[in-house]
């Protein structure tokens, strides 16, 4: 039944990943494991249990939430494998929204960097993002590592889905050499600027 479901330009085939067919409407408290990285300027909270996303980034100098995040975790049934949670910064690969955005990923902390990643069963690749904050900087750095464990060339997309509050203080800027962008599907190429 699910294999014929088209999902944002991708096949609904998800085997061998687990599929969650429904979620409860019952509200209950739940604790999530989190990594907190901070310096005197910013504080970032990372949630490896929810697909390895950056849940929040706070500007400590003015108590401003740099990215939009939900105060509660309330999944919706819009993900390829079922649940998905909006907000924060979601790291996606090898296709549009990762199928595992609500599934725990591997994580470890090493040398003041938190590494979160997983093995992709569809393409036999491993993707990891290392998140760090330098002591004297007011930004978060993401270091991306993709490893192809096969002898074959693999196409993939890597993108970060960042939630921001819509207001007049935000703009999307691309380098001047960017002439095209992708939608959810790598086959959907749009000219830039629009």
What is the meaning of each model-derived region?
Residues 2-29, 34-38, 85-139:
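Extended, loop-rich substrate-binding clefts of extracytoplasmic carbohydrate-active enzymes
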Residues 24, 44-62, 118-167:
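Acidic, contiguous internal or C-terminal segments within carbohydrate-active enzymes
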Residues 62-93, 98, 141, 147-194:
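Polysaccharide-binding surfaces and accessory modules of carbohydrate-active proteins
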């Amino acid at each position: 039944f699910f294999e014929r479901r088209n999902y944002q330009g991708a096949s609904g085939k998800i085997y061998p990943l687990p599929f969650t067919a429904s979620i409860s409407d019952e509200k209950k408290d739940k604790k999530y494991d989190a990594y907190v990285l901070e310096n005197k300027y910013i504080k970032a909270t990372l949630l490896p249990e929810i697909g390895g996303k950056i849940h929040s980034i706070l500007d400590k100098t003015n108590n401003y939430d740099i990215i939009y995040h939900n105060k509660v975790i309330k999944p919706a049934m819009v993900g390829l494998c079922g649940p998905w949670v909006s907000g924060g910064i979601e790291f996606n690969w090898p296709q549009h929204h990762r199928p595992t955005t609500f599934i725990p990923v591997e994580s470890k902390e090493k040398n003041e960097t938190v590494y979160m990643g997983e093995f992709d069963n569809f393409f036999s690749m491993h993707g990891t993002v290392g998140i760090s904050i330098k002591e004297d900087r007011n930004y978060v750095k993401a270091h991306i590592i993709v490893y192809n464990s096969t002898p074959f060339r693999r196409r993939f997309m890597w993108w970060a889905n960042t939630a921001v509050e819509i207001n007049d203080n935000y703009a999307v800027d691309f380098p001047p050499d960017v002439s095209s962008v992708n939608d959810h599907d790598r086959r959907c190429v749009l000219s830039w600027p629009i």
